[in-house]
């Protein structure tokens, strides 16, 4: 179908098709993540980000492409999750800004908008890396600019853009050695290609295949957490204290999935069980006393791609407290000079952050990146003139920076990439000092700590010069896999032996749901025997998937 001009309605249809196609392929994009850890989430993050943009567009009823573009940009900005989601939002922010005054655009203007998006995205990334989504977007836009000098058909232009995006994606391993080593193309670039393929299908009048959408667990379990119902019971009456939700990407080669057996086996761990499944995914909601048992069982069937655990006793106490307050308007708490927003996964880690001064802890991290809007809401809830944000994950830093750019408060993003870095930064904070001095001290603190993790591999791969088998426990030091073992305790010993230097004085061990206090104490005994001068601190972090998070400083 030949299209000479693009109006708002046609562009809106393209956006919805692009979002749908990305959703269809999110699992395939996740599978391209370089690290074989159980939290590969590029596809998930891009899907959630694009879906947020598409929802804003769905609310529009206009032929004005500038207004549709602005809606897309707004939705993407606030819904962006992870570095890939933020870059996607910046690509379409630049695109939308370029067309914001136009009611419709031609092929040349469409190409110029693609290029404006690339320019905006490159500016948003402090150190752009080629062989990523940025390269794919840049090459596709360059192709569009060249072709648009003669081509007036937007469908033909989009065809060329999509073909060049795919060719550029296939070249990414030549630009980024780690992709070549692992044998994959860039996951973010693949996600962008999925969006472009959806755009093209829409322009051609083709329908993007729709898969059945699993019902929302939030909708299905809302009655379980209704505040009025909770206010009628006593906290001590809650037998199973942790609301546990997990999404499993089913792997039939791992264990054949039978929903009845799956449901029956899970029922032994708690009550209020709900299981929703299709051919590729299973969603679980259960109230359990030991959430780790649920996660361990679910892992037998495939990769855990989303986890949420909430302490219902703590929530219930909070609800009772809130509902017992007078209904009349009370004076809000006085505004504070400083506030600290941090991100953490695991009840124990969250409690640690609160105990050393965090104002708000956003639930999230390795397995669930918070959106820009989540971080914005947290900053506003602090009610402080100046807020420090500790992302504690390299994949959350860009969303934190994006949140900082849209709030009125003075915000400092301390680029902590790990939980230990975040804790060191928070301990360096002094409320009696000026904001800039605190920023300097916190930035210095994150440079002084070495961070390590122990988790398991979700697939066979070759990375960092090592052959890794599915199920192996990996020791990861400052982002590099240093070795593997068949059991998590041995992996932790290997990791700490590599990590600890002669100048280190304190080792902190945060053991997760897959480890135990007894095992952590064995690790402590190992360290005490090998390093007599080292002080060892052990905490139950209760984090999922990562058996140990450790630090040395």
UniProtKB/Swiss-Prot annotation:
Disruption phenotype: No visible growth phenotype. InterPro entries: DegV_domain_contain, DhaL_dom, DhaL_dom_sf, FakA-like_C, FakA-like_M, YloV-like. Signal peptide: none annotated. One of its GO terms (molecular function) is glycerone kinase activity. SMART domains: Dak1_2, Dak2. One of its GO terms (biological process) is glycerol metabolic process. It comes from the Bacteria. NCBIfam families: YloV. This is Protein YloV. It comes from Bacillus subtilis (strain 168).
